[in-house]
Amino acid sequence: MFVEEITLNILQILPQLNFGGVETGTINLAKRLVKMGHKAVMVSGGGKQRDTLAKFGIVHYTLPVHKKSPFSIVYSIKKLKEIIKEERIDIVHARSRVPAIIGGISSYLSEIPFITTCHGYYSKHIFSYAMTWGKFVIVISNSVGRHMLDDFGLPLERMRLIWRGVDLEQFHFREPQIQDKNIYTIGMIGRITPLKGHKFFIKSLLMVSKVMPNIKVLIVGDAPENKVKFKEELKGLVNRLELDKNVEFVGEFGNIHQIMSRLDLLVLATIAPEAFGRVIIEAFASGVPVVATNVGGVLDVIEDGKDGILVPPQEPREMAEAILRVLKNDKLRFSLVKEARKTAQIKFNLDTMVEETLRVYEETVTVKRILVIKISSIGDVILAIPSFRALREKFPNAKIYVLVGLKSRQIVQSCPYIDEVIVFDRNKEGSSFRLFRVAKELSSYKFDIVIDLQNNKISHLLSFLCWAPSRYGFDNGKFSFLLNHRVRFIGLGVINPVEHQSKVLGILGVDIKDYSLKLWPTESDFKYIDEQLSMEWVSREQPLVGINLSSSAKWQTKRWPLENFIHLTDSLAKDNIR
């Protein structure tokens, strides 16, 4: 199935809509969604770009999703649920931690899928784990992906790597030319914070200015409210180094492509791991050579010496040498610029980013993750085979998992209707401890649907602790309030086990048409059977019947009187059945 065949209503939620890499990528995606016939809804705390959305057909709601106050979060969850219902949202897509908490809980309560995009590195705080709540988690670089895997245990099968993309139509490429001029313009673009390395960049300019006294430097971006003092410190450093005639603090600037058109070189001086570095690919697209520090996701973007120059962080001298090398060497500059443009066209273009994001959206809504719980005896699991078959027929593209007891594992191991078997061994450890260990494992799968065919307290509790938005089962009073889709026992009468299961599947729109039971023995099973028959001098053609005496100590209905077994064996013997 292609993404063009599905019309989706997508809600993206992020803290604010000011000028920055996250905001730019989010808005670019929303604009393309609208252009392709989808509905794009955005929720944020407002910002300088908020009022530009309407002209692109993007719906925006302002909520305090940037605030960490518990009262604010609860309020935003309530309001977001209303927005999800009103706009008929198919997917909620969060791009930061507090929005992930709000979006994750709201989508869970609304029974719709939730995904996240990790745009940076997160401290190992409990709230940071909200970024792993998505059915799929998009990471913007290999570096961020490794961080989410190592620090938060995010399973690889739920991770999707999608490079950020630049709009090649917006950033016009300038063919490199031989430069015979005295004034060169160097730019540094980004928020003014200590981690961005402005201090080391400014120190490198002192050395550059001794060789090129007429350089012009544009520091684009502003300091957040809690870093205003740091910005003043940088201005003081510029004055002390007598670079005030060279360096201009431009402030926040919305049209980055206009800034790029003025630059001869872009510098990224980050001292901490950079998640990606959108400004690098914007320079690539514009024909502006780049010198950057070799940290984090920058290594995923720049191939040193081919499409950019990498230098160690916090090393002003090496940075100055790299700046001078690029500006004074036309051959090197030409080569860097041309290769960088190819990199942007092939790897970091907006069209590819949008297409791959839409594929994740499509997979999110079309490939359901379904868990069936049947942790009882072997016979009961065999009787669930018609339910497995019916689910596969109803959801051919779904990933269907089954939770069974240890002894029942082999019964469904080769079942073609099931993608994965998960074992719940109640005897392995203490019951309560084991229960919550299994629950933690199950929650990592991010199931869309849980179907509880076991129908007891443990299975109801496991259903709830999976954190699946939709949970189906019987309303039997045994913790069944933990299920949000229930069938009542009253009025069902005496029915066989398969019909019993069909009542639960029925509220999911699944009809069991084939009640037949089937097993899938392996080659090793047949080999074992042949060996056993040979030892007993029994041919394969000989009809055999196995009888399980006293199959259940718990259920009196499964225990025949002795005379019934005598009658049965006599009848079988008359037909030469052993």
Label each PLM-derived region with a short phrase.
Residues 23-28, 193-210, 217, 229-232, ...:
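A conserved mid-protein helix/loop that constitutes part of the nucleotide-sugar donor-binding site
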Residues 42, 289-292, 302:
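Short hydrophobic beta-strand element within catalytic cores of glycosyltransferases
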Residues 108-142, 146, 152-154, 482-489:
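A conserved, positively charged/aromatic
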Residues 184, 365-578:
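Catalytic machinery of carbohydrate-active enzymes
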Residues 226-231, 244-253, 259, 309-310:
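Active-site donor-binding acidic/aromatic loop of nucleotide-activated sugar
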